[in-house]
Design a protein with these regions (language model features):
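A glycine-rich dinucleotide-binding beta-alpha-beta segment and adjacent secondary-structure elements
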Residues: 127-129, 134, 306-386
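Glycine-rich loop(s) and the adjacent beta-strand/alpha-helix scaffold that form part
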Residues: 157-203
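N-terminal Rossmann-like FAD-binding beta1-loop-alpha1 element of flavoenzymes
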Residues: 3-29, 404-408
Length: 409
């Protein structure tokens, strides 16, 4: 039996502590906040998208950074293992669109309560309001921790599960990165990810609050396509957000360091250029004397129609029967490729996750143990791993935490 200290009471830390205790170790979970799962509490807009019920091949395809590093973690703890654990812990789950898994109650607090019960039942000592400042090592192995109040606690194994840099108000202030660096670990460059983006165009701000459904969103760096998907997005006072944009941000954030990127919205992806042109011809021929500025409301929401009229460059007072073939072709092109310029991503305060973290080449993938410091383990967002939206990032936390708890000897 080993004496184990887990630093961080988020998803990864709670899972690591639970598994280590179930395997017979004496476990102390240290959390600097006044309660466990503070970031977990706000995930999924307070509903907590605990995992995704897709097959593992699909889940692997949604991992953006270092997917191969996670094979052993997923083997140790799959999405079905997580769902079974939570439901057996007294929290019923449901599966929604996109195979996203939520508590039936739609309350993230029920997930945290479930883990709190499981931790107490397994004998984990939970100490809140305790901030770890340093990890103590002796002869190249983890030996304990120093606390902000000056106290020290000895241990045979240390689990670092302090999260990334997103939502700093929940305690994710980079402590784990600093402690890892102090022990010789490399922390890769970090960026906000799954985050809204700032755009150059003023017309975006004119559409603030407008949500688009069933559109295709594409981002390019010159001619190179970086991202393309179909779904929903939202215009804001600073640019764009919504599921498509959040996912795109994870694929483009590193490129934005160097330059602006071009984005395009296909407002009518179900129609080819020819079909859209035929639709416009039909609409225009039915109301020949209508002014162009009033002719697009059947095709787009009113606020968007107004901006498309302006962007088209066609005289808004022109009667639709006078619109030329060339003008119509430009309108089709605009509808199928509405252009935007992405300037930057928003800050960590608006980011769901952090991209970047402890370099995985310095961590044993089969155990999550440090290759540099014996008895030191890593779990969750602290590592250089991340995925797209849909419950995948929490699955990374559960799986890496579980593997740590099962690997400590």
């Amino acid at each position: 039996m080993s004496k184990v200290i887990v630093i961080g009471g988020g998803a990864a830390g709670m899972m690591a502590a639970l598994k280590a205790a179930e395997n017979g170790h004496e476990v102390t979970l240290l959390e600097k906040n006044e309660k466990l799962g503070k970031k977990l509490f706000i995930t999924g807009k307070g509903r907590c998208n605990v995992t995704n019920a897709s097959d593992m091949e699909t889940i692997m395809s949604q991992i953006v950074t270092n997917p191969r590093f996670l094979y052993s973690a997923f083997s140790d703890c799959s999405n079905t293992d997580v769902m079974e654990l939570i439901e057996n812990g007294g929290c019923p789950l449901k599966i929604e669109r996109g195979q996203r898994v939520f508590p039936e109650s739609d309350k993230s607090s029920d997930i945290i309560s479930c883990f709190s019960r499981l931790l107490k039942k397994s004998g984990v000592e939970i100490i809140l309001n305790k901030e770890v400042t340093h990890i103590i090592t002796e002869e190249g192995r983890a030996a304990g921790v120093s606390l902000s109040d000056g106290k020290k606690i000895s241990a045979d194994a240390i689990v670092l599960a302090t999260g990334g840099l997103s939502y700093a108000s929940t305690g994710s202030t980079g402590d784990g990165h600093r402690m890892a660096r102090e022990l010789g670990h490399t922390v890769t460059p970090c960026f906000p990810a799954l985050v809204p983006v700032n755009t150059k165009e003023d017309w975006c701000r004119a559409l603030q609050g407008l949500s688009l459904k069933n559109v295709t969103f594409t981002v390019k760096d010159g001619k190179k396509k970086l991202y393309e998907d179909f779904g929903e997005m939202l215009f804001t006072h600073f640019g764009i957000s919504g599921p498509l944009v959040l996912s795109a941000s994870s694929k483009i954030v590193k490129k934005l360091d160097k330059n602006q990127l071009s984005a395009f919205i296909d407002l009518k992806p179900a129609l080819t250029d020819e079909q859209l042109d035929a639709r416009l011809l039909r609409d225009f021929s039915q109301e020949k004397n209508k002014q162009f500025k009033n002719a697009l409301n059947g095709l787009f929401p009113a606020k968007l129609a107004e901006q498309i009229v302006i962007l088209s460059g066609i005289n808004p007072d022109k009667e639709v029967n006078a619109i030329t073939k060339e003008e119509r072709a430009h309108l089709v092109s605009l509808t199928k490729n509405l252009p935007l310029t992405i300037l930057s991503v928003r800050s960590y305060n608006e980011a769901i996750i952090t991209q970047g973290g402890v370099k995985v080449q310095e961590v044993q993938p089969k155990t999550m143990e440090s290759k540099l410091v014996q008895g030191l383990y890593f779990a969750g967002e602290l590592l250089d791993i991340d995925a797209l939206t849909g419950g995948y990032n929490l699955q990374l936390a559960w799986s890496t935490g579980s593997l740590v708890g099962d690997s400590i000897v």
